[in-house]
Each structure stands twice: as C-alpha cells, then as structure tokens.
Design a protein with these regions (language model features):
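Conserved HGGG/HGGXW glycine-rich cap/lid loop of the alpha/beta-hydrolase fold
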Residues: 40-92
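Active-site loop/oxyanion-hole signature of alpha/beta-hydrolase fold enzymes
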Residues: 74, 84-122
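Gly/Ala-rich beta-loop-alpha elbow adjacent to hydrolase catalytic centers
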Residues: 126, 130, 134
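Flexible "cap/lid" loop of the alpha/beta hydrolase fold
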Residues: 135-139, 147-176
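Conserved alpha/beta-hydrolase catalytic His-Asp/Glu region
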Residues: 159-164, 177-230
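Short beta-strand/loop motif that positions the catalytic acidic residue
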Residues: 234, 240-242
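Conserved alpha/beta-hydrolase "acid-adjacent" motif
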Residues: 247-252
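Catalytic active-site module of serine/aspartate enzymes centered on a nucleophile-bearing elbow/loop
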Residues: 265-296
C-alpha cells in the first residue's frame, strides 16, 4: 500500500506531463530542428520577441514537460525570444546510445544552436541536468552568454557528484527498469519512498523515453565537471536558484565562495520537484534579466 498522498500527486503530475509532451510531439506546438556539428538532430521551439533566452530541461524531461507545463515558456515569451530545446537523448531530438555523445557535447549543442540561429549571445536557463549543462557552458563558451541561470543544480564537481547513484541509475535504465535510483535520491521529506512508489514513479519518468539513450546521458555526466579555477575567473553574470529542501543544495552552496559573478537565491520550503513550478522561480529569473538590461 502507498503510504503518502504525495505519491499520488507526483505520479499524476508525471502522467500529465507525459500527455503534455505527447500533444506537443503531435504538432500542437511549432517545432524546428537543426543538425548539430556531430550529426545529431536537435529539435527546439521558438516563441516571442526580444533578447534570446535558451531553456535547457532536466533528465527525462523535454522542453514541453519542463518549461511549457510550468507556464514558463508563455510568460517569458511576453518579453523575450524564448528558445526551448529538446536536448539530445530526449523528446524529439536524436538519441545516440554512446555516452561520448553526451556530457560536454550537450553544452556544445547550445553553441551550435546559437550559430544556427545566427545569434551571437543569449541568456541560458537550465534546470537540474540542464543547470549542470549551463554551468559547463559558462566554462566552455562564456562569450556566447548574456547571463546564466542555474536552477535545481550547482557546482558539477567530482567531490559533490554521487557516482554510486549515477552508476545505479544508468544500470537500472540499461536493464529497462526505469529511473528508480533517481526517485530515491530526489524524494522529498525524511520518510523514504516505498519500493512500490520507486517502481511506479521510476517507470512513469521514462514512459516516453529511450532508456538506453538516457543511460548514455547518465554515463556521460562526469564530462560536465567544471574546475574551481574556471569558476574563480568567471565573468558571466550567474544566478543560482534552488529549493531549501533540494538534495542538490550542497552543490549550490559550494558555488557561493568559489564562483565569481555569482549570486544564490533559495526558495524556502521548495524541493527539487516543486522549485520550477514556484512563481518565485520565474519572478526571480525575470527580475535578474531586467536588472542586467537596465530596462525596468
């Protein structure tokens, strides 16, 4: 028996997001694509006008499920040109099964996208996995960024990475058993999930995904590491947003005394599942952009 009403809410949310993503894939929102420099097809959506803002979703997500369902695409598109990406291994984009096709390569996709759209610079907003990719992009191509927003993530360093969890997650995905280890790691509250909860939510997370591609994404995560030396010389204005109850908060805290041009905003009471849908998340991002352009 499932012990928590929260379980039903989490599962219902995942099912709804899967349906939302499926509707987008069937053409209810306009999509475009280009071929990245290594030959992988990348799909993206563009809405609005103004300074460009690239949105990078989390693992198992899509542009629609992370950003569309939360209303962030629509709200930002009122003031900015929003470019929401289905990252490789996800959604409508290509899904190679080689870990070498991920990691740093996922950050370079953003550079390729900007080149494809003939944009010299853009704001980049990433959440969870997308946040770690944004950190890598800050290190790799700072001249292409107007600013960076790192949500639900922080410093992707070897010391803070949970290699055991990533290994277990990759093995689970390779066996076709879903994202259970990630469910256990991100589960909010002190009471752990039941095996039934882990199984149900772990399978719902990957219902519309290629599990072998996701496993390759996970095995490529180590290539997102960023050195302290690069963080100390950073010149890209960087906003880090994380929930006070997010298990990845130590990654965010570690940036405070290390990263130049960095500020941390904590959403009190929010966890990894609720931060993105909090009105405070979007309000904080919007205020950051307006401050940078002095256009309030």
């Amino acid at each position: 028996m499932f012990r928590r009403p929260m379980f039903r809410a989490l599962l219902a949310t995942l099912v709804a997001l899967t349906a939302f993503t499926g509707a987008w894939a069937q053409g209810e929102a306009p999509t475009q694509s280009f071929t990245a420099s290594d030959g992988v097809e990348i799909h993206y959506l563009v809405e609005g006008r103004g300074d460009p803002v690239v949105l990078l979703h989390g693992i198992t997500g899509t542009a629609a499920s992370n950003w569309g369902a939360a209303g962030i695409i629509g709200r930002l598109a009122e003031e900015f040109q929003v470019i929401a990406v289905d990252q490789r291994g996800h959604g409508m984009s290509g899904k190679p099964h080689d870990p070498a096709s991920y990691g740093e390569r996922m950050a370079l996709d953003v550079v390729d996208l900007l080149d494809h759209l003939r944009l010299q610079q853009a704001h980049v907003v990433g959440y969870s996995m997308g946040g770690f990719i944004t950190m890598k992009l800050v290190a790799l191509a700072p001249d292409r960024l107007m600013s960076a927003v790192v949500g639900g993530a922080g410093w992707p360093s070897p010391e803070l990475r949970d290699d055991a969890m990533f290994d277990a997650l990759a093995a689970s995905l390779e066996a076709g058993k879903g994202g259970g280890p990630l469910v256990e790691f991100l589960w909010p509250g002190e009471e752990p999930p039941t095996p039934e909860q882990v199984q149900a939510i772990g399978q719902a997370m990957v219902a519309s995904n290629d599990q072998m591609a996701l496993a390759a994404v996970v095995r490529g995560m180590a290539a997102l590491d960023v050195t302290a030396e690069l963080l100390r010389i950073n010149k890209v204005p960087t906003l880090n947003i994380i929930g006070s109850e997010d298990p990845l908060k130590p990654n965010a805290d570690a940036l405070v005394d290390t990263m130049n041009e960095h500020r941390l905003h904590i959403i009190e009471g929010a966890n990894h599942m609720t931060t993105l849908s909090s009105p405070e998340f979007l309000d904080t991002v919007r205020a950051f952009f307006i401050e940078l352009c002095n256009c309030a």
